[in-house]
Each structure stands twice: as structure tokens, then as C-alpha cells.
A protein has these predicted regions:
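Charged, glycine-rich intrinsically disordered N-terminal tails and low-complexity linkers that flank
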Residues: 1-78
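Generic structural marker for isolated residues within well-ordered, non-membrane alpha-helices
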Residues: 49, 84, 155
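Nucleic-acid nuclease catalytic cores
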Residues: 73, 89-114, 118-176
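Basic, amphipathic N-terminal segments that precede the first structured/catalytic domain
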Residues: 79-90
């Protein structure tokens, strides 16, 4: 029997973590985007082997010497606040950040870093959470209202961790 009456666990505050500390904490668990890799559904091409190397601290043989891959993959982090602000402006909902890692209380190896939560202005409790994304206008995984499968897996993982039933995705399409 599945227990659906649980309170999500705040695993650790990330407010004062460096990027390196945050990355090290992520290595100790399986997150939403990791789950998509494990299922073979990552549209960025990350492999299970790369995930294994990352989780075990093994450096890749081929490095990203010029940092191009890092810039592309981290652009979402750089633009996350702007995406959340646009979401709030367009919906009238308040997007707010809780700088923490959340852990599933029944499966402590599953953790999530939630981009934002959202609520009605003037209210205290969240309605759900917001996943902030950025992509190229040429990304064929986004067609119409279809959300890329790996994002669906990521969001499903977070819904389970948080014991919530609502999530919104806000995506900024960047021209190339």
C-alpha cells in the first residue's frame, strides 16, 4: 500500500552553499533529471555511464576545455530568476524560492532542488511548484504544448518528493 499522507522532508538548506558544495550534495542522491537519465529519456544525450561517473566522482576522459557545454547547460541557472519573474508577471501568481534540497521521506536517496514554488498573492501556502526552463527556439522536443519526456519524469519525481499534485512549467525560448 502506498502511503500518500506524508510531509516532504527538507533535507538541507542550500542558501549558503557554494556551487561546488551543492554539486557534491547532489552526488549523494538521485534527482529528477537523474531519473530521466536512468530511464534513458534524457534529450540532452547524457548517458547512464556519465551519470555513474558523476555520482562516483570519476572525472570524464574527454573534458569540456573551452567550457562551452558548461555555459549552455548552466544558462538555465543564470536565467532562472528572469523566467520566474516572467511567469509571475504573466499569471499574477507569486513565484518564490526556498533555497533547499528536499528529500522523499520514504526514499531518502531521492532528492530534489525545486526551482520555485508558487502561490496566490497575499496567501501563505503554495499551490504547487514551478519548474523554470530555457531552450532554443529550434529545440524539436518542444512542439506545441508537448513537454519533453525527460522534463515530465523530472516533474513527476518532484511531485512525489513534495507530495504535491500541481506543477507549472515556464519556458523561455531563446533565439539563436
Amino acid at each position: 500500500m502506498i502511503d500518500k499522507n506524508y510531509i516532504p522532508k527538507l533535507y538541507k538548506s542550500t542558501a549558503n552553499m557554494t556551487v561546488k558544495e551543492w554539486e557534491n550534495e547532489r552526488r549523494n542522491s538521485i534527482g529528477g533529471s537523474d531519473m530521466a537519465v536512468l530511464l534513458g529519456l534524457n534529450h540532452f544525450g547524457r548517458t547512464k555511464r556519465e551519470l555513474f561517473y558523476d555520482k562516483t566522482g570519476i572525472e570524464p576522459i574527454v573534458s569540456d576545455e573551452d567550457g562551452y557545454k558548461s555555459i549552455i547547460f548552466n544558462s538555465g541557472h543564470f536565467l532562472e530568476e528572469m523566467v520566474a519573474d516572467i511567469f509571475s508577471y504573466r499569471t499574477g501568481l507569486e513565484a518564490y524560492e526556498i533555497k533547499a534540497m528536499f528529500e522523499h521521506p520514504h526514499h531518502p536517496h531521492i532528492r530534489g532542488n525545486i526551482d520555485r514554488f508558487y502561490r496566490r498573492k497575499g496567501e501563505k501556502d503554495p499551490i504547487g511548484f514551478l519548474e523554470c526552463k530555457t531552450t532554443s527556439e529550434y529545440n524539436r522536443n518542444w512542439t506545441g504544448d508537448k513537454i519533453p519526456t525527460d522534463y515530465v519524469v523530472q516533474i513527476s519525481t518532484y511531485l512525489s518528493i513534495l507530495n504535491m499534485d500541481k506543477c507549472k512549467i515556464s519556458c523561455l525560448f531563446i533565439p539563436e
